[in-house]
Amino acid sequence: QKKLEKVLKTFKVDTIYHAAASKHVPLVESNICEGARNNILGTLYVVKAAINEKVKNLVFISSDKAVRPTNIMGASKRFAELCLQVYKEKNPLTNFSIVRFGNVLASSGSVIPKFKQQIMEGGPVTLTHNDVARYFMTVPEAAQLVIQAGALGKNSEVFVLDMGKIIKIRDMIIKMINLAGQKLKDENNLDGDIEI
């Protein structure tokens, strides 16, 4: 926290975009203490440093998994959100905003490059369950949401992008297979190219 405060003071920081986190659910589930340390304590250090150095705005990048969390990663992000809300009540000089993201296409750790690679290698494409569905947003949409939250945020408001319809991952994989000039191989098409 002291090093962070020194950086904030040296560069007279006006706005912090706090995106550092352990965000991959399986990784956090198998490393609970490290995930909690990164997502909760890391956020707490940033919040305290921002307050101590009188930073005007702090935008916290959270997750859609913080809504009624069903895993450690989501719970740690929700706990971090609550920390911001508690500190805001006692420290009116720093504006806190919370941005909840779904899955950002082509971001680090996105499943899209993994699926693309599996298709290019001839499959199979790994899918945990046929009914899995997710919301997706583009990098420009995510960036716009973060910037708007920084400009508009007051009182630890939570900003969520309307991400439209939920997308079944299986349907998305089938479209990716077709776009690659291949055909799905399943019980209905044994002569196809790529299995899921």
Language model: regions and residue ranges:
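CheY-like receiver
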Residues: 7-11, 49, 145
